[in-house]
């Protein structure tokens, strides 16, 4: 819903399309392939949810629970993304603390040869970007990863 509002407010209607889907459900039959897939999936390990700050605990459990190790959604998305992306597309994830290397490795196993992990302003690994080697984003990601 927020992405659609942003498309409208930035006057990108007609140039940008958005789709919302359940990443753990069966893959939807989308028309065409995506240039960009961005995901901020639930990434908190199930056992850690009870110990979260009260304000975070008020969030719907589906927005928090990433499974036993917090990586369930990343496994599914990295497996399915190559089937739904253009050859030189870009995959971007927000990640939880200490998940950067695991998510980066999943991207590599899925065939993304250019992978970069970026830190937030507090110095915590927060984003993973992935693209096919030789694609239009590959050189940029390799530069970011340095």
Predicted regions and their residues:
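Mobile active-site "lid"/loop adjacent to the S-adenosyl-L-methionine
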Residues: 43-72
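Short glycine-rich, flexible loops that bind phosphorylated cofactors or substrates
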Residues: 45-47, 100, 137
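Conserved SAM/SAH cofactor-binding pocket of Class I
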Residues: 1-53
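Class I S-adenosyl-L-methionine
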Residues: 51, 62, 69, 83, ...
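Flexible, glycine-/basic-rich loop-and-beta segments that form/coincide
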Residues: 131-146
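Conserved Class I SAM-dependent methyltransferase catalytic core
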Residues: 68-132
